[in-house]
């Protein structure tokens, strides 16, 4: 895992077309802004896990049919 330190207003660049900017820090939370092409899906980890769980359930249902 790459670990980087950024201050508010500073940006990371991922690949050629994704930027992640630190917008603010409040206590133990940070606000980030992400610019990426529409074709790139961006989810919080817990939402991504739910999506994957639903896909797995759907695959099992289709396998049973």
UniProtKB/Swiss-Prot annotation:
SUPFAM superfamilies: CsrA-like. Pfam families: CsrA (PF02599). InterPro entries: CsrA, CsrA_sf. The keyword Lipoprotein does not apply. It is found in: Cytoplasm. Gene3D superfamilies: Translational regulator CsrA (2.60.40.4380). GO terms for molecular function: mRNA 5'-UTR binding. The keyword Aminoacyl-tRNA synthetase does not apply. One of its GO terms (biological process) is regulation of carbohydrate metabolic process. Its main location: cytoplasm. One of its GO terms (cellular component) is cytosol. Keywords: Activator, Cytoplasm, Repressor, RNA-binding, Translation regulation. Homodimer; the beta-strands of each monomer intercalate to form a hydrophobic core, while the alpha-helices form wings that extend away from the core. Belongs to the CsrA/RsmA family. A key translational regulator that binds mRNA to regulate translation initiation and/or mRNA stability. Mediates global changes in gene expression, shifting from rapid growth to stress survival by linking envelope stress, the stringent response and the catabolite repression systems. Usually binds in the 5'-UTR; binding at or near the Shine-Dalgarno sequence prevents ribosome-binding, repressing translation, binding elsewhere in the 5'-UTR can activate translation and/or stabilize the mRNA. Its function is antagonized by small RNA(s). This is Translational regulator CsrA.
